[in-house]
């Protein structure tokens, strides 16, 4: 890994309800950026971020994990410290600690489940820390999932500042 100055480092936190797909998104980003050559699976117990024995047994994140990603931006290389946080609020202390150092947030939303409590809490935390954020929608391939309905619900709940910039 290269050496980066502070102006080239970004801390990005993954937030959302438990089971929304934060760790899967982290795995995909790690693979796309070349951190790993394969995507781990939670059910197989071989993800980069959920490596603790208890996390593997329970099949969900208990602690925040840092995944260093390197990205070639328009102004040169940058390092993104991706913070994969627990979604279950028994572990909210982990989320509070991680969000306090974040520069931006990705709120992961399960399209079928819609706006769950974890999504609302994630938004509230981003408001509290004045963090720029975006929604990343997962599970759109389910027959009972509607991307358009979810976008309307997000606009209704969080205001007109919600705007899709990538359509499925």
Regions inferred by a protein language model and the residue ranges of each:
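Conserved C-terminal guanine-recognition region of P-loop GTPase G domains, centered on the G4
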Residues: 99, 104-165
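Glycine-rich nucleotide/cofactor/substrate-binding loop typically near the N-terminus or early
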Residues: 168
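P-loop NTPase switch module centered on the Walker A-proximal segment
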Residues: 1-109, 115, 149, 158, ...
């Amino acid at each position: 890994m290269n050496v980066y100055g502070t102006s080239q480092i970004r801390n990005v936190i993954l937030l959302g309800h438990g089971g929304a797909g934060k760790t899967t998104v982290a795995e995909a980003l790690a693979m796309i950026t070349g951190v790993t050559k394969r995507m781990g699976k939670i059910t197989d117990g071989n993800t980069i971020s959920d490596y603790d024995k208890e996390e593997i047994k329970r099949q969900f994140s208990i602690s925040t994990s840092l995944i260093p990603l390197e990205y070639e931006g328009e102004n040169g290389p940058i390092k993104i410290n991706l913070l994969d946080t627990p979604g279950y609020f028994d572990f909210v202390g982990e989320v509070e600690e991680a969000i306090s150092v974040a520069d931006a947030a990705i709120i992961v939303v399960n399209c079928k489940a819609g706006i769950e409590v974890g999504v609302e809490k994630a938004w509230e935390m981003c408001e509290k820390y004045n963090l720029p954020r975006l929604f990343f929608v997962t599970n759109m391939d389910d027959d009972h999932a509607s991307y358009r309905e979810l976008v309307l619900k997000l606009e209704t709940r969080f205001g007109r500042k919600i705007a899709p910039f990538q359509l499925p």
